[in-house]
Amino acid sequence: MKKIIIYIFASLFFASSSISGITFWTTEVQPARMAKQQDMAKDFESKTGISVEVIPVEEKDLGKRATAAAAAGDLPDVIYHTLQYVLPWAEAGIL
């Protein structure tokens, strides 16, 4: 058991050390919410050394943008979205 735990932590360490940046799409595009997300991204970067690019996406455009990005092989690392997208995106292989 101890060997498994050590292996898991070592894997996580080496996986995270190769990440230089994260792309984050958010539908929380209101100025106050964007400012808070930017602050959280800066805090995360200061603690991990991993930069976060916060990209606002209007909720009405999210489905089309995600589908196009998936087709182009250029999805972001993280998408903040509503539950309505979970099943169709899972079926399409986006999630």
What are the residue ranges of the model-derived segments?
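Conserved N-terminal structural module of periplasmic/extracytoplasmic solute-binding proteins
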Residues: 4-7, 17-94
